[in-house]
Amino acid sequence: MTLLSVKNLNITYKNKEKEVYAVDDISFDMESGDSLGIVGESGSGKSTLAMGILRLLSPKTAQISGNAFFKENDLLAMSKDEFNKLRWKHISVVFQKSMNTLSPIHKIGDQLEDIYKVHEPKATKEQIKGRVL
């Protein structure tokens, strides 16, 4: 089963002066267990691609077209509430500058535990530990 399917994804940044085509017609499919490496020069759109799929770009500055499906879910068309049920539970990303996201003074397990508790507030400590370690 295809886990993530991205088809003809385009992301354009707009300002008053010009448009910048950051992601141009990208397509790929990923199955369960697949790994994907995205390689390119600084500023070539790698982070923009991930941020677009995860809907982390402001619609005021970025225009997204194309399709991104997680299983049967159209990531770019679903409501914000529906998407938030998937984010960090079923689909996530660790960006290249993870020090901006993850705290170096806290254990990674504790940080992942916090995210897990948001999605599974009734989970026991044992269940949480089994999931994050």
Where are these regions (language model features)?
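ABC transporter nucleotide-binding domains
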Residues: M1-L133
